Amino acid sequence: MSFSDDGWGAEAEVKVAEDVPEKNVPPPVEPPRAPQSTAIKTEPERNSDEPSAGFGIDPITTSKTFGSQTTPKTEFGGAPSLSGFGGNAAAAAANKTSFDQQGNGFGGAAKHGFGGVGGAPSSFGANVIPVNKPSLGHKTTGFGGEPKHVSGGAFSSANNFDQQDKGFGGAASSGFGNGSMLTNQKVGLENQTTGVGASEVPTSKPSSFGQQPAVVSGFGGAAKMGFGGSSSSGFGGQKAGATESSGFPTKETSTSQPGFGGDSSTGFGSGLKAGFGGHGAGAAENSGLPTETTGFGGKLPSAGFGASSSNESAFGQQSKGFGGATKNGFGGDSSSSFGSGSKAGFGGTSSSGIGGQKPGATESSGFPTKETSTSGGTFGSGFGGKPTSTGFGAPSTTDSSSGQQTAGFGGASKPGFGGDSSTGFGSGLKAGFGGHRASTAENSGLPTETTGFGGKLPPAGFGASSSNESAFGQQSKGFGGATKNGFGGDSSNSFGKRDSGFGGPQDQGFGDTDAPSKSGLGSFNTGGGAVKSAFGAAGFGSSSNFGNGNTFGEPSDNQRGNWDGGERPRGCHNCGEEGHISKECDKPKVPRFPCRNCEQLGHFASDCDQPRVPRGPCRNCGIEGHFAVDCDQPKVPRGPCRNCGQEGHFAKDCQNERVRMEPTEPCRRCAEEGHWGYECPTRPKDLQGNFLESYDFVFTPDDKMFEDAVNNDDKIDFDQKVVASTGKVEIPDMASFDGFKILPQDLHDNLKRMKMNRPTPIQRASFFPIMHGNDVVACAHTGSGKTLAFLIPFVIKLMEEFEKDRDVTDEKPSPRLLIVAPTRELVNQTFTTARQLTYETGLKCGLAFGGYSRNANVQHLRSFSQLNILVATMGRLQDFVNAGEVSLSKMKYIVLDEADRMVDSNDFGEEVSKIIGSPGERTQQTVLFSASFSEDLQSDDLPKFVKEGYTMLQVDKFGTANEKIDQKILPVPRTEKRDAIYKLLGIDENTVTLLPDAPIEKQKTLIFVNSVKFCDTLAALISSAGVSTISMHSYQNQEQRDRTLDDFRRGKYQCMVASNVCARGLNIAGLDHVVNYDMPDKNGFDEYVNRIGRTGRAGFTGTSTAFVDVENDTDIIPCLVSILNEAKKEVPEWLTEGAGHQEEGGDDWNEQEQEW
């Protein structure tokens, strides 16, 4: 017969004589190995009628306790007749196998190595010394066995892992704990063993875990120093000089040694005091786990586990042990023991024991008890108790064959836990935990007939001795069994067997090599993903466990969410419907949690109508009940001043000189050293469409403010006529600014830096009215110098006041001059001009507009001890005033730039009125400048903002376009505008490429459209033709807009597509061409004038082109005709026809100039 000789796939055949006489066997000569001098003492054969004592049972007698040896029969650790865990080989003839018996049980009498007998150095379960036969008359082969054939080193004889001398407990050739291939058929002590460490007479079947046919020393066999050896340091071993080996804990006779499992004083299973399963010297019997003193299953006076004494508390002993027979042991038969025989034991014989015996029973049998006639009681009266009880473990119906009940947990019939029928724990027929069948009338404790833990007959008990099922350590399929699927068996499913064992070579072992159908870890055909049910088959990485099937990694078909490897479907968290996620859900948002403010369900905290409840103390004063923003206590700084580093005040209140703190860390934007994030030259990533994104405004350094200054004196018409609406207005006729005698030298120097040598007509006309304190309304075409026209006189006034109040410090930002403009770009441009003009004068200029980080904006305004000039948009100004960040109490002068929008009641008029008040109440001087004023504004809105007697100044005519702009009007239907723009710019409409000498290559062009979205689209179309193009609109954040405008001004881009944000006030140097791709609406007269006014500024000439759709732009055509006429431009005939009937009376808004 062949079997696995190394437990890993290789096969070998070893034939052994049927009967081996007891004699010393010389060791083989092994030059590389150092032999040991220790020899094995022989032991007499044990009588098969000797009571059993191991973790296992005896089919003939009935023991009462768990590990007791007071009666011939045994259960869990009983007398040494059956060969269970820690069993004895004495009953081998009747029981065939033990899990720790004298022969080759776990913890047997062998000596050397882990399962070995001899003394070879560093062998794993090996032995090399010739010794006398152990008690069974054969060499040991099991786990801790003695060598049958001494043959070389570990893993060297026939390459077996469990070989004769150094195998993992093996003595011959095969498997995990298998013995050699012997043929002896003796019965009794020399029976073949199959348990873990069991010893039996060899048969045609290979041996089990830790066994060898006809050999004594399995796991803890008969040698000396093995794991459980018999001499000094074995795990449960026998003392030197012992005549018997008894499996796991051994029996001692004379002296003792202190090995691990030795029989001396401190060994694990030692024989005197504290061993695990040790027994006393001179004891008549050795019964596996129970030994003499304090061992696990000890026998004599101390307190061993399952000891048999009557005075101590051994676990399972006679007195108080676990399963003891006297007083209060675990399973004892007296009064309060666990499973005692009287009343309250766990499994006691009276009324309330769990597993108690039926009324009238004469014996107590520990955990599950034996019954005789009838039973009764309820829960608490029989853990495996009486047939009529219904309690925990109680039966419910009577089995006709046994007279017991069937359904109790530990009941007497079939499915009880410990019942003796079919599925009980320790039951007597099939599936008990350690059950056996000695007869159907007797059920004695945990071990029962068949599939019990340590069971004996056909099914699959732990350590059972049958030949056809899967007992743990049995002959058939036990743990270390010899036939089918034992642990270490050599047949079909054993651990380390030839078919599917651990390392088996055939079907499905660990590291299996050929069979493709089963399921070992790393089996032949599928490796870690085999077909069925081991690690790597239906387990890890296969169809039903980890990595597949219905556990970790992928669910099975019948589970919720079988997605066949696809993405797991997930419904909307808001509405529960599939097909979209919650952020795309068009249903109203449903709160899933209580409101964080009022803790009520049904609404969000942002929608809560209850007063806001602070969740902690005030961050300012530390008192509960209010927020820091509502705290009435003075604000307490949490750290040192950021300016001077001193404690006790905020940076905004710091009286020390403003100190620029050098950065101590890299810039947060570019990670470079040497500058703060707000000074970073790089720009953050564009966030298109996020127009609410704020940023830190980057100011132009003082030394670079004048780099873009251009002298345009040769292009400006200084002879333009200025008309005043009031009596006599002195308009000085000066060729240069030197004629302004009151002009301070610092201001004069700054004008030279700005390359302003001569005042423009509007600057000359507005100078003295403003200096005299009059309210002024000035109208001049774009690019005529309006900004300096109001700045120069006001700066002169501010410089005079600053000399008087130089030491005054404002508690909060309080501007003296307030300039309000409609767009951020115009605010920024005006602020830059004001900084240039006040350079080195001591005056401080600030700005405020949306898009600039609010906190940074506030800090910017607070950084001045005096704020002389503030340039702001209406929205941010209103915010700061309402929040108390800015005070207007010291304001003396107000300027409304692009005033036609600022005073229009349909635009900013209402907000401006709230800020500056009515003219009758207002003491401040007010100046309004714009490129156009309609008659309606003059009559209806201007009186609300300026005082009576104001001065109106006009350069040429109100609302006229700059004559230096060449206006072209083209009839283009809406559907043909794209082709028209391509043609106008010099782009081939078929190939979308630039034509030779394309006009766009020579002209800086600004294209206006009405749709914000179409800005980006048209810019992309033009850019695809190879023209450097960029877009600018209100949906961009302010930093994008500033950067775009700056890049276009500097010539980085040749073309820009913009919405109306670029229509007013922007000075774009060198702009050659303005295109109105879309015309303004019917109210867009002023808008058209301002759009085309971006070119032809400061005396330069420019060109404008308008695409007019006759069908859709009919409302603006009359206004357009009038503008062309007044600008002395040719009006196309088709445009005049388009005006049609609207000509008559349609231009009353453009009547002749009034008499002033």
UniProtKB/Swiss-Prot annotation:
A motif (DEAD box) lies at residues 897-900. SUPFAM superfamilies: P-loop containing nucleoside triphosphate hydrolases (SSF52540), Retrovirus zinc finger-like domains (SSF57756). GO terms for molecular function: ATP binding; ATP hydrolysis activity; JUN kinase binding; RNA binding; RNA helicase activity; zinc ion binding. Residues 986-1139 form the Helicase C-terminal domain. It catalyses: ATP + H2O = ADP + phosphate + H(+). Probable ATP-binding RNA helicase. May act redundantly with the P-granule component glh-1 to regulate the formation of the granular structure of P-granules in embryos. May protect somatic cells from excessive apoptosis during normal development. This is ATP-dependent RNA helicase glh-4.
